[in-house]
């Protein structure tokens, strides 16, 4: 697997300090932002002798003067004797008749905005076009080739002059600073007096305080030089230690990941670097390290990273980035094809022996009792460019929204580095919860698998033009070494995240190729034996699941915003605002369902002890009190969930559960008849990704004041069917564009995963792992006490539903 940055040589990162493409974009941005001032001179070949030489000198001087003026527009200075000028005028003809050489008279031609835009775009692509490119450009713009040639010459000259002026300004600032420091030292030395006698002090007694200040200043300079050297290593260009710091603001956070394409794709910050930020990455590093950005904390709250050597985190992040890129590119023998490992369902498996020989352990040796899980997957994602996806991955809210079925909770406490010039190149985050515990909670939708609680750094870097990488690596050991401690839930699974992440490469057809690598070590002692093969194979939280979820979500966003015809499975004819409100309600329903299945801290569920009665140990029952909670009925809410193995393929099981005509075979809400579809909103080209509103068959008294809101999601890694009964008046309000947050619902549903290659002690092959979960209102009074009867009711509902499903699929063995 090869990437454009692999073996590209000096063409990838331009080594010329005067005209690198990055700086070219910066100056271009400044020029265009200020009005885009430039003059292009096209000299003719008619004039001769000494007059012609003087005319050329005058032309060059005028061009330079025009370039230095900030208020001029894009003009063409064309000699009347030029071939493009159409010849001379009457005065020139008279001079020629008297034998005198014609006078050079300049005619100014103003470029149109379209011509300027085309020239600027071509300059960003190729600052040195060849003759063929200039001819093609001149023909397209209606200009002479010579005009195009001189426009590019003047553009390069202008950029070089501005860069030189900027560098001279920095050198002057540094020189003034050194002069001032030297003067203050001389004054302190000459005016020093002895405290005891009042006379002149000896040099050794001058100022012990100043001596300490000098030592501290030297130490800080040495530390800054070390950090700048580290930054230069991954930026690929030299870093100025004396560059003035710049204050970078935190990146804005949109309201929802459903606004990804609007706020993240369509309005991405410009990748060009303005001239004010050419002070190198040292300024950004100084700012971000001196002023800690804590978006989840108030300004008065002390930072958990205060006084910590953050360069160590940067070293760890760069080491992890190097390992991720190599693992994404390398093949055999590091990655063994799946055909060579018959017991593995993955396309390829990591050769752990080769891995240990190739990469030094960046986070220490594997703890005793931990098992390893590694996977790699590639796929094409429907998104405009990789930079937009990087923005989503580097924003913890949008990241957790994008992978809501896999991420129970995540947030960012510290933003060590915000990146360069507003982009995410070089951004380094500590991903954590709001209590300064750097962590994220990864979930498998089953009560038999504890939450994976991981503490890690997230680091993004632009490897080449159109190529990005985002890497995660656990920071537990480093945090402990720095004296940062955090309490983790004992009910969660201990987990370490080795260098994992994705490499994003823009494709010519406007999509993004994503190569995802997942490498984790965890303690599987708390995992039920039914799910251990699934986790080890990477089917639960491996690279394939991340890729499949990303593809499904991006397809959904692209479809909802596109103006193309709706898929056949979309029957919605409601107002766009009503569609948005209905999708928002379905999203909340699915999130509540996931929170009820897992043991995440996002919801205050309490596991019941002593009230389980005859319930089996594989059925997990939890309860919580709802008091004045929008979107949830008041009272005591019970949640029960369990997971079972089903000897049917996941596709067949999913098709059965979301089939409206077969609903009566397992759902007591169907009133014994098929469901009728009121409306449906497609979330993908496949029939399995929809949000629909169902209506149950009427009862004997022909009264039915209830609808069923249902969301189904399906991809190559698994599927879900989530539903909840809703009131008809409330749904009328939602479908007319009203606020959906006031609609009370309690979700129930199913999560389906493909079973691992070997399940349990009897080695059952294939099949599906089905998770069933129900939430019911046990009592409408929040202060009421639970009874064993309420717990047994929800448990019996689960058992009865599973039995009906097995009977309908003829797999009740």
Curated annotation (Swiss-Prot):
SUPFAM superfamilies: Bet v1-like, Homeodomain-like
Name of protein: Homeobox-leucine zipper protein ROC4
Gene Ontology CC annotation, any one: nucleus
Family annotation (InterPro entries): GLABRA2/ANL2/PDF2/ATML1-like (IPR042160), HD (IPR001356), Homeobox_CS (IPR017970), Homeodomain-like_sf (IPR009057), HTH_motif (IPR000047), START_lipid-bd_dom (IPR002913)
Record's compositionally biased regions (Basic residues): 101-112
Residues that span the membrane, as ranges: none
A matching Pfam family: Homeodomain
Role description: Probable transcription factor.
Primary localization class, coarse: nucleus
């Amino acid at each position: 697997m090869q990437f454009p940055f692999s073996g590209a040589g000096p063409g990838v990162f331009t080594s010329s300090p005067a005209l690198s493409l990055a700086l070219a974009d910066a100056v271009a941005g400044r020029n265009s932002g200020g009005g885009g001032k430039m003059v292009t001179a096209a000299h003719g070949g008619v004039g001769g002798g000494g007059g012609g030489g003087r005319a050329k000198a005058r032309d060059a001087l005028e061009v330079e003067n025009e370039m230095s003026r900030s208020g001029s527009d894009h003009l063409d200075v064309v000699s009347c004797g030029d071939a493009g000028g159409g010849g001379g005028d009457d005065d020139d003809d008279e001079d020629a008749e008297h034998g005198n050489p014609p006078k050079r008279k300049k005619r100014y031609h103003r470029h149109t905005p379209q011509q300027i835009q085309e020239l600027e775009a071509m300059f960003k692509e190729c600052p040195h076009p060849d003759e063929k490119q200039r001819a093609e450009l001149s023909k397209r713009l209606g200009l002479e080739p010579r005009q195009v040639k001189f426009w590019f010459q003047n553009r390069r000259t202008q950029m070089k002059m501005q860069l030189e002026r900027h560098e001279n300004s920095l050198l002057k600032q540094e020189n003034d600073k050194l002069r001032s420091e030297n003067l203050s030292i001389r004054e302190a030395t000459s005016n020093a007096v002895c405290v005891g006698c009042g006379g002149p002090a000896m040099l050794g007694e001058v100022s012990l305080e100043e001596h300490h200040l000098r030592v501290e200043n030297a130490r800080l300079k040495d530390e800054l030089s070390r950090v700048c050297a580290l930054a230069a290593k991954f930026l690929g260009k030299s870093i100025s230690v004396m560059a003035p710091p710049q204050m970078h603001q935190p990146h804005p956070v949109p309201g929802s990941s459903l606004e990804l394409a609007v706020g993240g794709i369509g309005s991405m910050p410009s990748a060009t670097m303005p001239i004010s930020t050419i002070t190198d990455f040292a300024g950004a590093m100084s700012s971000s390290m001196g002023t800690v950005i804590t978006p989840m904390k108030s300004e008065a709250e002390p930072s958990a990273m205060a006084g910590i050597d953050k360069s160590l985190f940067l070293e760890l992040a760069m080491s992890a980035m190097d390992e991720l890129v190599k693992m994404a590119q390398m093949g055999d023998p590091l990655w063994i094809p799946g055909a060579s490992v018959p017991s593995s369902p993955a396309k390829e498996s990591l050769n752990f022996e080769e891995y240990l020989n190739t990469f030094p352990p960046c986070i220490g040796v594997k703890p005793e009792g931990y098992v390893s899980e590694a996977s790699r997957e590639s796929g094409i994602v429907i998104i405009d460019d990789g930079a937009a996806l990087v923005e989503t991955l580097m924003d913890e809210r949008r990241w957790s929204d994008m992978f809501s079925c896999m991420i129970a909770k995540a947030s960012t406490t510290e933003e060590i580095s915000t990146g360069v010039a507003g982009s995410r190149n070089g951004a380094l985050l500590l991903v954590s919860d709001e209590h300064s515990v750097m962590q994220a909670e990864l979930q498998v939708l089953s009560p038999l698998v504890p939450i994976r609680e991981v503490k890690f750094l997230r680091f993004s870097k632009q490897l080449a033009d159109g190529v990005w990488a985002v890497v995660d690596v656990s920071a537990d050991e480093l945090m402990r070494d720095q004296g940062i401690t955090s309490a983790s839930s004992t009910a969660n699974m201990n987990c370490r995240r080795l260098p994992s992440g994705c490499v994003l490469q823009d494709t010519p057809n406007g999509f993004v190729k994503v190569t995802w690598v997942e490498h984790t070590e965890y303690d599987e002692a708390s995992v039920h034996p039914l799910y251990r093969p699934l986790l080890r194979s990477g089917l639960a939280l491996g690279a394939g699941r991340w890729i499949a979820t990303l593809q499904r979500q991006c397809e959904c966003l692209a479809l909802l915003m596109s103006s193309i015809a709706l898929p056949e499975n979309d029957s919605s004819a409601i107002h766009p605002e009503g569609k948005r409100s209905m999708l928002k309600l379905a999203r909340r329903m699915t999130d509540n369902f996931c929170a009820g299945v897992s043991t995440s801290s996002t919801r205050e569920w309490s596991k019941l002890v002593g009230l389980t009665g005859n319930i089996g140990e594989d059925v997990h029952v939890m309860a919580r009190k709802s008091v004045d909670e929008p979107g949830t009925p008041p009272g005591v809410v019970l949640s029960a969930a369990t997971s079972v193995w089903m000897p049917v393929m996941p596709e067949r099981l999913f098709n059965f559960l979301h089939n409206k005509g077969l609903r009566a075979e397992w759902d007591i809400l169907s009133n014994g008849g098929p469901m009728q579809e009121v409306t449906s909103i497609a979330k993908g080209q496949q029939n399995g990704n929809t949000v629909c509103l169902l209506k149950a068959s009427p009862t004997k008294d022909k009264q039915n004041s209830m609808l069923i809101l249902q969301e189904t999601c399906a991809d190559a890694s698994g599927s879900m069917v989530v539903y909840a009964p809703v009131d008809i008046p409330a749904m009328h309000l939602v479908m007319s564009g009203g606020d959906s947050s006031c609609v009370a619902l309690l979700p129930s549903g199913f999560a389906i995963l493909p079973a691992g290659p070997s399940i349990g002690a009897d080695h059952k092959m294939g099949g599906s792992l089905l998770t069933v979960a129900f939430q019911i209102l046990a009592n409408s009074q929040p202060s009421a006490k639970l009874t064993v009867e309420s717990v047994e009711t929800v448990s019996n509902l689960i058992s009865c539903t599973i039995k009906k499903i097995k009977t309908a699929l003829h797999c009740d063995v």
